[in-house]
Amino acid sequence: MEERNEQVVEEVKEAQVEEAVTPENSEETVEEKSEAALLQEKVDELQAKLTETEGRTLRLQADFENYKRRVQMDKQAAEKYRAQSLVSDILPALDNFERAMQVEATDEQTKSLLQGMEMVHRQLLEALTKEGVEVIEAVGKQFDPNEHQAIMQVEDSEFESNAVVEEFQKGYKLKDRVIRPSMVKVNQ
């Protein structure tokens, strides 16, 4: 009986070996490997798409943050320079006040009128100063093309080269932005 058991065990082992080597099993193994390779390709493809999508998402987030920052800066600039158009409109009237105040008063009534104009002029300047408007200094300063507009050149030994000799029209700045440059005569 032991012999018979040994024989049955050997037959089972041979059957298992034959089963493992049969063409059907080898096809299944190839199919499993092919299926595994296809699944791996699909995983790799999905990983690439995920990486691309993550990159695109990060770029969109960065673009949105830049947009928010730009909008905030534009809003701050609009708030900072909100009075620019009003100031630009008032400057010619201010110039006319200054020209009118240069007239010499001969009688008391004219002197009184000039005093009233000077008070209004001073109040206008104070209101503009509160908004951040300042007069651009010109005479005796070095010519700065950002703040001055040269309309004449002269040679004057009393002034340095490239210095402003005379101012024909005052220039104004609103905070750090030039509203109107000074019209000046510059030494060569």
Curated annotation (Swiss-Prot):
Main location: cytoplasm
GO biological process: protein folding
Biased composition (Basic and acidic residues): 1-16
A single MF term (Gene Ontology): protein homodimerization activity
Cellular component, GO, one term: cytoplasm
UniProt superkingdom: Bacteria
InterPro entries per UniProt: GrpE (IPR000740), GrpE_coiled_coil (IPR013805), GrpE_head (IPR009012)
Region (Disordered): 1-31
Localization in the cell: Cytoplasm
Assigned keywords, A-Z: Chaperone, Cytoplasm, Stress response
Pfam family, one: GrpE
Function field: Participates actively in the response to hyperosmotic and heat shock by preventing the aggregation of stress-denatured proteins, in association with DnaK and GrpE. It is the nucleotide exchange factor for DnaK and may function as a thermosensor. Unfolded proteins bind initially to DnaJ; upon interaction with the DnaJ-bound protein, DnaK hydrolyzes its bound ATP, resulting in the formation of a stable complex. GrpE releases ADP from DnaK; ATP binding to DnaK triggers the release of the substrate protein, thus completing the reaction cycle.
Classification via NCBIfam families: PRK14140.1 (NF010738)
Subunit relationships: Homodimer.
PANTHER family: GRPE PROTEIN, GRPE PROTEIN HOMOLOG, MITOCHONDRIAL
Family: Belongs to the GrpE family.
HAMAP family found in the cross-reference section: GrpE (MF_01151)
Protein name: Protein GrpE
Organism: Bacillus cereus (strain ATCC 14579 / DSM 31 / CCUG 7414 / JCM 2152 / NBRC 15305 / NCIMB 9373 / NCTC 2599 / NRRL B-3711)
Gene: grpE
